[in-house]
Structures are given as structure tokens and as C-alpha cells.
Amino acid sequence: MLSRTLRWLILAMVSALPAAAQTFELGSMEPRRTLSVGVLYAHDSWDEYWEGTLKRSNGNIGTLTTQSVTMMTGYAVTDRLGLIAALPYVWTRASQGVLHEMSGFQDLAFGAKFRLLSSRPGRLGTFGASIAAVAALPTTDYTPDFYPLSIGTAGRRAAGHLALDFRSNTAWFANASASYMWCSNVRLNRSSYYTDGQMYLTNEVVMPNVVNYTLNTGVELGRLRIPVSLVQQRTLGGGDIRRQDAPFVSNRMDFVKLGGGLMYELPKNLSVSLGAARILTGRNVGQSTTFTSGLAYALHL
């Protein structure tokens, strides 16, 4: 059986790279005492980005490529409560210019989800609701002050999620979720910085919080599952990239992303996944295309 616990993280990566576990498929739970492990590879690249609302290319960057390998695990404590953890190793590279590549372990994400309710099977199908809480902590002292090559924000994050789901009596499923993510302040290795039209004589940067809205739908045909997702991210604050300047860690980063994938169950509790996603529109982000592939194994203890 394809691990439902690891579906959360697979869909999270397809929807919102490179941050682990920002969005989840919350509509199903793994049977109690099921341990899941998996690995996910992601390749994300862009050669155009939005400088505020101005879309442009940059000869000092060329094509910016971010790759990651994420180790994931999940455990179903009960039929209604599941735990997850994920740790990505990330490396970035610009094809032009003098900016050097960066690499390292990013943030350890861990959390839990709880199934609030599940309706009895009806004429159309079943309805349900779930909640989740996730936290992420940096595992290394990587710098957040080298965007767009920094591998992360180097800050602590915590998020709450709420999802409603529907599974038809045929092969169709859908769910909608919303999340709110709190972001801690981050510190730079310098005594001052300039952003959003102001000079700050401190090394501490106030980070804006983030909200995400996700729609997932698709079909499940025997061992094959085909999901499609639409994700909107809105940053609650932050300034735009200054004209002809580098991005900054606290910039407003908004986008709408369309993604899809294939998940197939193999014998012996193995499953494989392939995914792709494209940013349709954004602000202070690259118009990236993302490809993912994953392998998962589920064991009932």
C-alpha cells in the first residue's frame, strides 16, 4: 500500500519546494502502528523571476538550479493520529556570473496530523476534516544572506493546517486546505542592512508570516493515483526586491503554482512517485519548473 503518511510530504514537495511540509494531503490516515520511510529527489530551476511585479532575466545568474534529496519518515500512532519528520539536503547553483554554489542540510521538519471527523459512506461518497501542526528548525548554520543561492531562511517556523476532503464512491477525490505559518526573526553576519526603503542598524531581520491555500483533486485507479494541485502562497508583509539588486531574505514572496503527479504502488509495500509543478505567476520569486521523484516503503509493526 502506498503510505498515506508519506503522501503528505510527497505532495508538499511537489507543491512548495524547497520548504518541507508546507502543504499536506490530509484526507486519509494510515492504519495504526504503520511505519513509513522514504526518499524524495527534487530538481527546481528558473531563468526568469519577478523583481517585485517586473518579470525579468539576470545575466549574473543565468539559470538558477536548486536540487534536494529529502529523507522522510512517518508513523501512525492510532488510526486518527499520525507523526511525520523530514530532513532535506539542498544544493544550489547559478549557471552564469560569479555567485558561488551553496549546499548543506536545511531544516528538520516534524509534525503531527489528527483526523477530526469522517462521515459514513453516503450516496455521493465520504466527507472528512483533519488538522495538522508542523515545526521546522535549521540543522546547520547556513547563511540566509545570499539569496537566491541561500538554501533556506535559517529561521524557525511553525504552521497550523486545516483541511476538508471528499472521496467519491467512484475513483475521484478532492480536498481543500489552508495553513498559517509563523516565521521567527533571523540574524545576519553583518551589523546593518537595507530593505523596503529603510536602513536598519541591527543584524536581526523581522520575517513576515505566510499563508497557503491548496486545492487537490485527482483519481485513484487501483494501484495508480494521479493527483493535481493548485497552491497559492501569500506573504503577510515584506518588501519588494530593489531594482537591479539581489533578493533579500524578508522579501514578500508570493506565487500561484500548478502541480501534478503519478503515484504507483509496487509489490512488497513499496511505492514510487513522479511529479512536476510550474509557478504560473508570482512576486519576488523565480518562475520555476520543478520535477520530483520518490520511493517509499511502509511496514506494519
Which functions belong to the PLM regions below?
Residues S28-D47, A129-A135:
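Transmembrane beta-strand segments of Gram-negative outer membrane beta-barrel proteins
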Residues Y41-D47, L87-R93, L116, A135-D141, ...:
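Transmembrane beta-strands of outer-membrane beta-barrel pores
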Residues V39-Y41, M71-Y75, A85, F110-L116, ...:
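Residues on the lipid-exposed face of transmembrane beta-strands in outer-membrane beta-barrel proteins
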Residues E25-R33, R80, S118-G128, T170-W172, ...:
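Short loop/turn motifs that connect adjacent beta-strands in outer-membrane beta-barrel proteins
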Residues H43-S68, P144-S150:
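Surface-exposed strand-loop-strand hairpins of Gram-negative outer-membrane beta-barrel proteins
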Residues E48-G59, M199-L301:
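Outer membrane beta-barrel transmembrane domains
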